[in-house]
């Protein structure tokens, strides 16, 4: 079982009593599949206590010692050094005989037939974004091919629909697991759910396009075309009322709401309108991406400010304790002076 195990990143989690560091263990299988397991440091300690007695030749890496002075929540250097030490530890676990132990398999969330497991791969926070972008890119490409009239068989179109649906299901399941594991903040979870909802709307639109493209269209009969009483007949006499009805029926609808025609859209057919909408959305995406570095910088500043506030609170607590101790000493000194006086 040639596994590649690493700890690429960490995150913070908390409850009403304390905060702690969560280590993201990424397990990659030989077939290309991978998943992420979230563990705390005390879970590493519990695992080591179970398997350390079996280390007769001292081949297993040692766990980093627990620090009673500083915390990985506030000390970034300590958190990084512990991450590297734990990464070396889990890489030792990928070797025989440790990887064959049931307790290690349970710790790494590895099933007995993990080499053949290719479905339902759990995505970490970074992989989730990459798969989402690939899914959106593929959906856009399939839709452009369909709208441009390329000769694509029904089987290929159906395969594309199921491929996108499978990726979206995996994204949804992985996001639920990330939320349960507190691997992402509530704001980021909500943002990614909105991204999935928007992608789902685009997917439903693509499914309707595939269905309409594959459904046979009955040709109009000659009698209906030549019948002047038919409202759509080209031989029907024009009048004010009929012209108004025809204009209303021939308005193109893009999306849910009916948009008024402009000088630009009147010159375009359906494919041109679709390409124009895509170009508009790409421009909006570029504007959003240009704002991303600013938002990330603000996030980093917020984290630095939060860390500074935590350190200042700790210093104030120490100062308060020292002031309380000095006050007690002062009371004792005054009491002694009263006895002497």
Swiss-Prot record:
Single GO MF descriptor: SNAP receptor activity
Family matches, as PROSITE patterns: PX (PS50195), T_SNARE (PS50192)
Ranges where the PX domain occurs: 1-115
Pfam families: PX
Record field: compositional bias (Low complexity): 214-233
Residue ranges, annotated region (Disordered): 214-265
One term under GO cellular component: fungal-type vacuole membrane
Comp. bias (Polar residues): 239-251
Residue ranges of domain t-SNARE coiled-coil homology in the record: 278-340
GO biological process: Golgi to vacuole transport; intracellular protein transport; vacuole fusion; vesicle docking; vesicle fusion
Subcellular compartments: Vacuole
Entry keywords, A to Z: Coiled coil, Vacuole
Its job: Essential for proper morphogenesis of the vacuole. May exist as structural reinforcement on the surface of the vacuolar membrane and be required for maintenance against rupture by osmotic pressure.
Subunit structure: Possibly multimeric.
Name by which UniProt lists this protein: Vacuolar morphogenesis protein 7 homolog
């Amino acid at each position: 079982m040639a596994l590649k195990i690493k700890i690429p990143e960490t995150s913070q989690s908390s409850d009403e009593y304390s905060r702690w560091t969560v280590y993201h263990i990424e397990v990659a299988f030989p077939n290309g599949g991978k998943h992420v397991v979230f563990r705390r440091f005390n879970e590493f300690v519990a695992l080591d206590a179970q398997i350390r007695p079996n280390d007769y030749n001292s081949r297993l890496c040692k766990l980093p010692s627990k620090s009673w002075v500083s915390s990985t929540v506030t000390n970034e250097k300590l958190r990084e050094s512990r991450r590297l030490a734990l990464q070396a530890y889990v890489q030792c676990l990928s070797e025989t005989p440790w990887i064959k132990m049931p307790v290690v398999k349970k710790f790494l969330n590895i099933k007995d037939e993990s080499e053949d497991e290719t479905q339902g791969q759990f995505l970490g926070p970074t992989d989730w974004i990459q798969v989402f972008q690939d899914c959106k890119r593929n959906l856009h490409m399939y839709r452009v091919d369909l709208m441009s009239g390329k000769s694509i068989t029904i089987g290929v179109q159906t395969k594309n629909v199921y491929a996108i649906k499978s990726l979206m299901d995996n994204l949804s399941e992985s996001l639920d697991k990330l939320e349960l594991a507190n691997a992402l903040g509530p704001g980021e979870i909500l943002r990614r759910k909105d991204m999935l909802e928007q992608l789902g709307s685009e997917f439903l639109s693509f499914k309707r396009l595939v269905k309409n493209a594959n459904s046979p269209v009955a040709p109009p009969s000659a009698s209906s075309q030549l019948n002047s009483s038919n409202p759509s007949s080209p031989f029907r006499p024009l009048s004010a009322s009929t012209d108004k009805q025809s204009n209303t029926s021939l308005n193109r609808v893009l999306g849910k709401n009916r948009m008024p025609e402009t000088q630009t859209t009147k010159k375009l057919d359906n494919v041109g309108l679709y390409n124009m909408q895509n170009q508009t959305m790409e421009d909006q995406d570029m504007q959003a991406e240009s704002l991303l570095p600013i938002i990330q910088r603000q996030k980093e500043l917020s984290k630095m400010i939060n860390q500074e506030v935590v350190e200042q609170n700790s210093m104030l607590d120490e100062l308060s304790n020292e002031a309380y101790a000095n006050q007690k000493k002062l009371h004792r000194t005054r009491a002694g002076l009263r006895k002497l006086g």
